[in-house]
């Protein structure tokens, strides 16, 4: 039944804590495995160390109390924040002490960013390359210099101050993590009070966060950047606080500042249009978004989130109730709708985490695509190594988060799902027609795989036979991505109707001019053709297979026709016991394991597509006469339509820089390229191995030790099947990521 507003109001929100619930004891923590009765007894076999790592953060296995688990997670979040602040502080400190930031600031197009100087011990100083301006160091590709410029940082002193601030925040977070677990730990109802949490996160985190950044941009960044853009040297600029306290200073740059806040309260908001703009496009001096546009954007978001932060009903009997919304959410084909989902999301943190990981992972991938289409910071678009690094980084982060969503969805199904509380709701109905979902998804994967790969096989065959007129290409049988081209066209034409005062389209990827900074291309229209159409369908194929594996793992994690009692076997198990062959790799854990390989496939092709497409069709230079020349001279359209083209003109041709890097400042990438290949190959030893083989080997080695009376007291054991797979997939991905990283950076630092 729905609770009325009056009844809701009687349930007052209170912040309740338990005082001193858990003693602070270094003696206890010093004991390995203190969280588990079995592990605390110490090692009998080498399996103990594996179980120690597997269970240390599996709070469900430490206690069955949801309140205690919630407190541990809450406390761990503060620890995570402390690490992030410490890392950030280190980045800012390096910028202050070891970088050429000030030199870069005065000439960002000719000088490359560096914030790491390798000390000479046994000749590593070869890695300190000449980055311009007489500075020797390792070129960095993190984008920190560009974000510092956008923040209005112009001196090393400001970087030091921020680094100290980061250290202070890290200490504060560590203290908070200890305090809220050992001294004043919130009660379970505080963690389950979703309306209050939504209000505070929306209004506080997002609303005030956006407002703070908008305020900083308006008062500090925009005036400083305007002066830098007009050629004022960083040394001549006033200190940032001058812009805050001296209104005259800013009024010279933005006249509306002289009017103060009167236009705001008299609703003449148009007065502020000199620093809150709606220009669209990119600043031609920096190749980044107009900072006055981004300030406007964050101010608008702040208003939006501050309003949204008053949306949910807490102590005042007004606003939405999450439970009511979910239970009212019924459709003609959805039975009980979302009845029971509220209870799931307030009692299963795995279910909550699965949704959050899927959302944040997708958001990270969206960020990757916006970072190059609408470069947010000054001079980031012309720093090709940074652009490539940030795209790759956000794609990887997104992929891991999405696979993590599949993992925690399966853990929820095994550990937290209660069939009795979920009768005929959407979740139950999805699980009941899972066969239809999985078989259809499987059909889609087979269709996409055969057709997309078939187009490539056809092209390779025709090219081998010398029948180029029979190939799918822009010059023979065209497969133009007409829908994508239509969307591009709409987006390039739309601003003239929807925002007539805008100077340009939102992104030059859709159409418009070539934006070049110092004759180096920042962004330009990205033409799509047959090659993009073909690669796109490979993307569709690999993504659908990844989804198939993860969704099948989640939907069949409790039971299947093959193993009806899967839920009693747990989240990870090797098979259904002796005497049941053919039941390997069916656990929820194994689906995550398999999903990781396909996630790797998907993302490799996506980042390869991006890297080659940008070098071929976007990145390059413009001559004074206006002739555009690209790094690889537009070879994508004709080469990316065959498998041989990908192998020869992308992988092999662009690997020359990393392979020939020895003896140069890029030699570290050559070594990483080699070493990461070895790490990847090492993974195969675990992925193709049989456990019995190793156990036999171990036993003969133990016999030899006994013979010479040096037998170990801890009995050696071969890795379990699951442990072997975990080591295998970890090295497979680490090796693959390391190889790609070295390949990309050696290439783009050389030619970019």
Swiss-Prot record:
EC no. given is: 1.97.1.12
Q: Which GO terms describe its cellular component?
A: chloroplast thylakoid membrane; photosystem I
Gene Ontology BP, a term? photosynthesis
User: Where are the membrane-spanning stretches?
Assistant: 73-96, 159-182, 198-222, 294-312, 349-372, 388-414, 436-458, 533-551, 591-612, 666-688, 726-746
Q: How is the protein disposed in the membrane?
A: Multi-pass membrane protein
Q: Does the keyword RNA-binding apply?
A: no
Task: State where chlorophyll a binds.
Answer: 685, 693
User: Chief localization class?
Assistant: plastid
Binding of [4Fe-4S] cluster, residues: 575, 584
Pfam families (alphabetical)? PsaA_PsaB (PF00223)
Give GO terms: molecular function aspect only.
Answer: 4 iron, 4 sulfur cluster binding; chlorophyll binding; electron transfer activity; magnesium ion binding; oxidoreductase activity
How and how many cofactors are bound, per the record note? Answer: P700 is a chlorophyll a/chlorophyll a' dimer, A0 is one or more chlorophyll a, A1 is one or both phylloquinones and FX is a shared 4Fe-4S iron-sulfur center.
Catalysed reaction(s) here are: reduced [plastocyanin] + hnu + oxidized [2Fe-2S]-[ferredoxin] = oxidized [plastocyanin] + reduced [2Fe-2S]-[ferredoxin]
The signal peptide annotation in the UniProt record is none
Domain of life assignment: Eukaryota
Q: Which residues bind phylloquinone?
A: 694
Compartments, record wording? Plastid, Chloroplast thylakoid membrane
| UniProt keywords, alphabetically | 4Fe-4S, Chlorophyll, Chloroplast, Chromophore, Electron transport, Iron, Iron-sulfur, Magnesium, Membrane, Metal-binding, Oxidoreductase, Photosynthesis, Photosystem I, Plastid, Thylakoid, Transmembrane, Transmembrane helix, Transport
Binding sites annotated in the UniProt record for chlorophyll a': 677
What's the family?
Belongs to the PsaA/PsaB family.
Instruction: Report quaternary structure and partners.
Output: The PsaA/B heterodimer binds the P700 chlorophyll special pair and subsequent electron acceptors. PSI consists of a core antenna complex that captures photons, and an electron transfer chain that converts photonic excitation into a charge separation. The eukaryotic PSI reaction center is composed of at least 11 subunits.
Listed NCBIfam families? psaA
Entry's HAMAP family?
PSI_PsaA
Q: What does this protein do?
A: PsaA and PsaB bind P700, the primary electron donor of photosystem I (PSI), as well as the electron acceptors A0, A1 and FX. PSI is a plastocyanin/cytochrome c6-ferredoxin oxidoreductase, converting photonic excitation into a charge separation, which transfers an electron from the donor P700 chlorophyll pair to the spectroscopically characterized acceptors A0, A1, FX, FA and FB in turn. Oxidized P700 is reduced on the lumenal side of the thylakoid membrane by plastocyanin or cytochrome c6.
Q: What is this protein called?
A: Photosystem I P700 chlorophyll a apoprotein A1
The species this protein belongs to is Gracilaria tenuistipitata var. liui
User: What broad taxonomic lineage does this protein's source fall under?
Assistant: Eukaryota, Rhodophyta, Florideophyceae, Rhodymeniophycidae, Gracilariales
What gene is this protein translated from?
psaA
């Amino acid at each position: 039944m729905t609770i009325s507003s009056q009844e809701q109001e009687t349930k007052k929100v209170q912040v309740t804590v338990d005082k001193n619930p858990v003693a602070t004891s270094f003696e206890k923590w010093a004991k390995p495995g203190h969280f588990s009765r079995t592990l605390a007894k110490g090692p009998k076999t080498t399996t103990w160390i594996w179980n120690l790592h597997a269970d240390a953060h599996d709070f469900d296995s430490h206690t069955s109390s949801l309140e205690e688990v919630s407190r541990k997670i809450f406390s761990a979040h503060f620890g995570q924040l402390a690490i992030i602040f410490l890392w950030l502080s280190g980045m800012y400190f390096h910028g202050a002490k070891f970088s050429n930031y000030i030199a870069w600031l005065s000439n960002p197009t000719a000088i490359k960013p560096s914030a790491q100087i390798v000390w000479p011990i046994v000749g590593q100083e070869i890695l300190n390359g000449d980055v311009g301006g007489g500075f020797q160091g390792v070129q960095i590709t993190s984008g920190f210099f560009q974000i510092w410029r956008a923040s209005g940082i112009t001196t090393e002193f400001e970087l030091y101050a921020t680094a100290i601030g980061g250290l202070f925040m890290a200490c504060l977070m560590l203290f908070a993590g200890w305090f809220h677990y050992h001294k004043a730990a919130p009660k379970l109802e505080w963690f389950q009070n979703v309306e209050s949490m939504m209000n505070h996160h929306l209004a506080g985190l997002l609303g005030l966060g956006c407002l703070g950044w908008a305020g900083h941009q308006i008062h500090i960044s925009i005036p400083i950047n305007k002066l830098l853009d007009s050629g004022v040297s960083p040394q001549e600029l006033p200190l940032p606080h001058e812009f805050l306290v001296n209104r005259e200073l800013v009024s010279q740059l933005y006249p509306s500042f002289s009017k103060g806040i009167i236009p705001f309260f008299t609703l003449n908001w148009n007065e502020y249009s000199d620093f809150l703009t709606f220009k669209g496009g990119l600043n031609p001096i920096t190749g980044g978004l107009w900072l006055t546009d981004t300030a406007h954007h964050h101010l608008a978001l702040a208003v939006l989130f501050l309003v949204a932060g008053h949306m949910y009903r807490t102590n005042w009997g007004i606003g939405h109730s999450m439970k009511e919304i979910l239970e009212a959410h019924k459709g003609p084909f959805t039975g009980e709708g979302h009845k029971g989902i509220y209870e799931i999301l307030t009692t299963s943190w795995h279910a909550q985490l699965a949704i959050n990981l899927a959302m944040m992972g997708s958001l990270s991938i969206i960020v990757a695509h916006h970072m190059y289409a609408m470069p947010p910071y000054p001079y980031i678009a012309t720093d090709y190594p940074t652009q490539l690094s940030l795209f790759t980084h956000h794609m990887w982060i997104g992929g891991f988060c999405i696979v993590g969503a599949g993992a925690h969805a399966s853990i929820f199904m095994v550990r937290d799902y209660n069939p009795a509380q979920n009768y005929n709701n959407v979740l139950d109905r999805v699980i009941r027609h899972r066969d239809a979902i999985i078989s259809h998804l499987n059909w889609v994967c087979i269709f996409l795989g055969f057709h997309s790969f078939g187009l490539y096989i056809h092209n390779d065959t025709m090219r081998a036979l010398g029948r180029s007129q029979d190939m799918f290409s822009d010059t023979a049988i065209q497969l133009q991505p007409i829908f994508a081209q239509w969307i591009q066209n709409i987006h390039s034409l739309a601003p003239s109707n929807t925002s007539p005062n805008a100077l340009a389209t939102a992104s030059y990827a859709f159409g418009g001019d070539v934006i070049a900074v110092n004759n180096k291309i920042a962004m330009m229209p990205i033409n799509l053709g047959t090659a993009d159409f073909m690669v796109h369908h490979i993307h569709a194929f690999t993504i659908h297979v990844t989804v198939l594996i993860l969704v099948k793992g989640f939907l069949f994690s409790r039971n299947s026709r093959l193993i009806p009692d899967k839920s009693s076997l747990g989240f990870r198990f090797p098979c259904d016991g002796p005497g049941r062959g053919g039941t390997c790799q069916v656990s929820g854990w194994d689906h995550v394991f398999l999903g990781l390989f396909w996630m790797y496939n998907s993302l490799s092709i996506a980042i390869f597509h991006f890297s080659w497409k940008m070098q071929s069709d976007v990145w390059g230079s413009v001559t004074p006469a206006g002739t555009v020349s690209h790094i690889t001279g537009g070879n994508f359209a004709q080469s990316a339509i065959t498998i041989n083209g990908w192998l020869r003109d992308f992988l092999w041709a662009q690997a020359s820089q990393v392979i020939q890097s020895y003896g140069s400042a890029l030699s570290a990438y050559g070594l990483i390229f080699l070493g990461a290949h070895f790490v990847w190959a090492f993974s195969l030893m675990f992925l193709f191995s049989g456990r019995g083989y190793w156990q036999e080997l171990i036993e003969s080695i133990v016999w030899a030790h006994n013979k010479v009376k040096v037998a170990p007291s801890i009995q050696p054991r071969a890795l379990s099947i699951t442990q072997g797979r975990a080591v295998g997939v970890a090295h497979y991905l680490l090796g693959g990521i390391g190889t790609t990283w070295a390949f990309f950076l050696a290439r783009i630092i050389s030619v970019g």
